[in-house]
Amino acid sequence: EMLLKLAGLPYQTNRGGFRRAPKGKLPYIDDNGEIVADSTLIRLHIERKYGFDFDAGLTPEQRGAAWMFEKALEDHFYWHVVQARWCDAENFAKGPASFFRAIPWPVRPIVQAAIRRKIRGTLHGQGTGRFTPQEQAQLLKRGAQAAAQLLGDKPYFFGASPCGADATAFGFIASAMSPHFHMTLRD
C-alpha cells in the first residue's frame, strides 16, 4: 500500500482476495486487469509502467544499501512475522484463523492444521523454524537494532525523503507493532 501512496497512484484496498492472489499470498495488485503479485514485483511494475523512481535522490551507494535493507526485511524479518502469526496458537486465533471462515466447520480444523503444518515445514526449510524461541527473539532484536542504527536521527532511512526501503520498512514495522498480535519485538 505504501508503494502506491508514494507513487501517488489511486487504489482501493481489498484484504480478502486470496483466491485471486497468483502466488497464494498478499500483496498483489490488479492494475486494470493486469495482476501483479509480490511487493517487489509490484514495485518493479510501478517503476516500469508509471516511470516512478522510488529511490529518486539516492546516490548509487544508497540505492544499493536501500535494496539490501529491503531484502533483509523481506527475507529475514518477514519469516519471524510468519512464525509469530501462524505458529503461536493465540496469534493464529486472532488473525490467520479468519482466513478459513468459508470452510465448513467439520473440516475447518483439519484444513487449518494441515496448512499450519505446511507453514512450519516451510519455516524449518527456510531456517527460522530451526531456532529456539530465545534464538528467534535474539535475532529479531538484533535486526531491529540494526534498523534503528541505520535510521539514526534521520526522518527516513536514507535521507530527507522516503524511498522504497521506507515503504517496505513501514509495512513490516506496522505489522510487528500491531497491538492485535503478540510479537517479542514489542516486549
PLM feature spans:
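GST-like domain detector, emphasizing the conserved glutathione-binding G-site
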Residues: 1-109
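GST-like fold's C-terminal all-alpha helical module
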Residues: 79-187
